[in-house]
């Protein structure tokens, strides 16, 4: 898979994981695990990129004597999810076209 496409998909997956509630690194990985395998280092790179792009806000909270960063999605982050949904509709249309061509060739 193209690296830029994969990066974009992972960014949107992380945004979707915190869309409904603020979350922290370990919980994001745990919530995403049934759908996609993501290492801690990859996740924190994505979180930093999304924070820099103003799609996430970060707050630090003490939890059990340790500091934990909580991530909150911004309006820009929500907008990115909606843009992705529209882009994906187009991608699915292209996919159907490509596989239709393949299916027709298989039948001949």
Language-model regions: role of each:
Residues 53-67, 72:
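Beta-hairpin "wing" of winged helix-turn-helix
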Residues 17, 80-81:
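Residues that scaffold the ATP/ADP-binding catalytic core of kinase and kinase-like folds
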Residues 44-49:
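Short, hydrophobic-biased segments on the C-terminal half of alpha helices
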Residues 82-108:
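Amphipathic alpha-helical dimerization/coiled-coil segments
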Residues 2-42:
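N-terminal helix-turn-helix DNA-binding core of bacterial DNA-binding proteins
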